[in-house]
Amino acid sequence: MDNDNDENTIRVITPNKKSGEIYGIVEKMSGASRLIVMCEDGVTRNCRIPGKMKKRMWIREGDLVIVKPWEFQDEKGDIIYRYTKTQAAYLSRNHMLPEIIDVFNEKQ
């Protein structure tokens, strides 16, 4: 039970590629629980914040999110999860983010 790596372990939710979830960066707040999000596939989508997330998780411009595009309208989608700055930096450091949305990359 005594593991030295426990201090450095961070558990981060990743998009479920089988269900079509992708990474995105919030570009603009549109109002009425709507956001303009630049997704990893290069498409800018109009995404909505579901009711269960509205009050619990506040989303701002520049946040890294998981988006699930709608099946019947590909230019729209739902926000599934928002990463904290620490989680986003961790994903960037470990090269888990696609180049197109890796705005957290620290130049060395």
UniProtKB/Swiss-Prot annotation:
Entries under CDD domains matching the protein: S1_IF1A
Keyword presence, Protein biosynthesis: yes
Keywords: Initiation factor, Protein biosynthesis
Family annotation (Pfam families): eIF-1a (PF01176)
HAMAP family per the UniProt record, alphabetical: aIF_1A
Role this protein plays: Seems to be required for maximal rate of protein biosynthesis. Enhances ribosome dissociation into subunits and stabilizes the binding of the initiator Met-tRNA(I) to 40 S ribosomal subunits.
Name of the protein in its database record: Translation initiation factor 1A
Organism: Picrophilus torridus (strain ATCC 700027 / DSM 9790 / JCM 10055 / NBRC 100828 / KAW 2/3)
Gene name per UniProt: eif1a
